[in-house]
Amino acid sequence: MTTTTSGAPASLGRNELPPHLDENLLTPRFYTTEFEKAAKTDLEIARKDFEAMFKEMEADYNLKHFDRKASLERLDELSPEDKAVYESYLVRSVVSEFSGFLLFKEISNRFKKAGRQELGQFFTFLARDEARHAGFLGRALKTEGINVDLPNLPKKRAATFFPLSWVLYSLYLSEKIGYWRYILINRHLKANPDKVCAPLFDFFEPWCQDENRHGDCINLMMRCWPGMTKGFRGKLLSRFFLWTVFLTHTLTVCERGEFYELLGIDPVLFDEEVIIQTNNTSKNAFPWVYKFEDGKFLSMRIDILNAFKKWRNQNGIKKPLALGKFVLLILKQFTLPMEKTDAVRYG
């Protein structure tokens, strides 16, 4: 598929991926999980909190904030290079949001088929928000002359299976790190309005509110499975997913730093602030989080980034050696000290 600068959006061939979506470890993915196990979630141990969260999601506070008639045409003319950077961000974001929609929708359907109507409707609310976000991103892409065929995209990319505990840990972090990404970009653009190149960014404030609520919903689900956050298992899952999500965020943000620079944001400092805030927020859900006081975890990001770039750019016999250095660094970061939290748990 090719992009166009005018006229109707270009269309994808049957086996084509959207532009700017090369297949690699940092590409957004589609997921599936243990739906039958999820349907056995014991809500009674969290009944009061669940009903309060259900009412909040049902209220759909951001319905009127997402105006489907609002223009998403870019405000500024961009150079071909900056246009490609902006489009790349939109494509990867729309795939990520649509992936969340599909997962939440499937969980909702499985709950309803299992007779768990409350839980089914609960996840319908989450799917509603993700679909709304994907719709706005899709509209923004169409103004750039790109039409991503979202319904057929999962047919071109195999879904990745995760156990339920993995899905809940990763979903919580995905929503909370998304919240901090959106809110920090929103705050920066409000302080620097000259950097707002498209009206899409005007929707980032309600957008981040949705992400924050979704994280709280997933936290509630985790609390209904006490075994996921107890003992050695809880510590290992906390360590693994915090490390994985933070590492992926660092590599993605800094590898695609041109987008943040387009907005006047230093990608390295942005990545650091997002990680600090997400780690702190995770104290409300995870039994353990990384200890940042000594600065080792954050400072190692720079060494890891440099090793990653060297490996990617290296050729010949030196490439395996560069990969070995990169792997040793990330494993060293993985084993850094953690601290116990006071996260509320049921059971």
UniProtKB/Swiss-Prot annotation:
Its EC number is 1.14.13.81. Catalyzes the formation of the isocyclic ring in chlorophyll biosynthesis. Mediates the cyclase reaction, which results in the formation of divinylprotochlorophyllide (Pchlide) characteristic of all chlorophylls from magnesium-protoporphyrin IX 13-monomethyl ester (MgPMME). It is an enzyme of class 1 (oxidoreductase). Pathway: Porphyrin-containing compound metabolism; chlorophyll biosynthesis (light-independent). The keyword Oxidoreductase applies. Its cofactor is Fe cation. Belongs to the AcsF family. It catalyses: Mg-protoporphyrin IX 13-monomethyl ester + 3 NADPH + 3 O2 + 2 H(+) = 3,8-divinyl protochlorophyllide a + 3 NADP(+) + 5 H2O. The lineage of its organism: Bacteria, Bacillati, Cyanobacteriota, Cyanophyceae, Synechococcales. InterPro entries: AcsF, Ferritin-like_SF, Rr_diiron-bd_dom. SUPFAM superfamilies: Ferritin-like. This is Magnesium-protoporphyrin IX monomethyl ester [oxidative] cyclase. Keywords: Chlorophyll biosynthesis, Iron, Metal-binding, NADP, Oxidoreductase, Photosynthesis. One of its GO terms (molecular function) is magnesium-protoporphyrin IX monomethyl ester (oxidative) cyclase activity. HAMAP family: AcsF. Pfam families: Rubrerythrin. GO terms for biological process: light-independent chlorophyll biosynthetic process; photosynthesis.
